[in-house]
């Protein structure tokens, strides 16, 4: 089966401390790899101001992860867990061209 390349961008609440932020990022990286994906890159974009408020926040910490997977299981599990976690304000997953 052909592997598909995905990019996930998620926004973390700005008031979370550094240790908790690192633990959150590590947990989401592990969720993706535990579900059969190969992580290519995981990088922090830092704090950025929003164009509009999200859950009463005017800024958030952006994080981007790129990975390849044979099926959508890592994407589905990441989406499910990011919606449950109250430290994540928003997330978006896109399928990249080969």
UniProtKB/Swiss-Prot annotation:
Tagged with keyword Chaperone: no
Coiled-coil region: none
Keywords: Ribonucleoprotein, Ribosomal protein, RNA-binding, rRNA-binding
InterPro entries: Ribosomal_bS6 (IPR000529), Ribosomal_bS6_sf (IPR035980), Ribosomal_S6_plastid/chlpt (IPR020814), Transl_elong_EF1B/ribsomal_bS6 (IPR014717)
One Gene Ontology term, aspect cellular component: cytoplasm
One Gene Ontology biological process: translation
Gene Ontology MF: a single term: structural constituent of ribosome
Family under the similarity heading: Belongs to the bacterial ribosomal protein bS6 family.
General function of this protein: Binds together with bS18 to 16S ribosomal RNA.
UniProt name for this protein: Small ribosomal subunit protein bS6
The gene coding this protein: rpsF
């Amino acid at each position: 089966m052909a592997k598909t390349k995905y990019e996930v961008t998620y926004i973390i609440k700005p008031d979370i401390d550094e240790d908790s932020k690192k633990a959150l990022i590590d947990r989401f990286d592990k969720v993706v790899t535990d579900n059969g994906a190969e992580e290519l890159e995981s990088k922090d974009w830092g704090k950025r101001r929003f164009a509009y408020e999200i859950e009463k926040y005017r800024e958030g910490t952006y994080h981007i992860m790129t990975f390849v997977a044979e099926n959508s299981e890592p994407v589905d599990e990441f989406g499910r867990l990011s919606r449950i976690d109250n430290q994540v304000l928003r997330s978006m997953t896109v399928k990249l061209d080969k």
